[in-house]
UniProtKB/Swiss-Prot annotation:
Protein name: Large ribosomal subunit protein uL29
Gene: rpl29
Keywords: Ribonucleoprotein, Ribosomal protein
Cystine crosslinks: none
CDD domains reported in the protein's UniProt record: Ribosomal_L29_HIP
Lineage of origin: Archaea, Thermoproteota, Thermoprotei, Desulfurococcales, Desulfurococcaceae
PROSITE patterns, per database record: RIBOSOMAL_L29
Biological-process GO terms, alphabetical: translation
UniProt-listed SUPFAM superfamilies: Ribosomal protein L29 (L29p)
Length: 67
């Protein structure tokens, strides 16, 4: 997910997507523990998407604008 896509979302959409990603991360971590996870890079990508969403939400909270 690109930062521009996240910035175009409404606050509610971001929160919904954040919750979806967190749930998916939990499921993938469980799969990794059991040994059924095939794409280990997916965990890293989800963590990065979560960080991007949280960063953009914090930027808006502080009034920092990005191009």
């Amino acid at each position: 997910m690109k930062p521009d896509e996240i910035r175009k979302m409404t606050k509610e959409e971001r929160l919904r997507r954040l919750n979806e990603l967190r749930l998916e991360l939990i499921k993938l971590r469980m799969q990794a523990r059991v040994g059924t996870l095939t794409n280990t890079a997916r965990i890293r990508n989800i963590k990065r998407d979560i960080a991007r969403i949280l960063t953009i939400m914090r930027e808006e909270e502080l009034g920092i604008s990005r191009k």
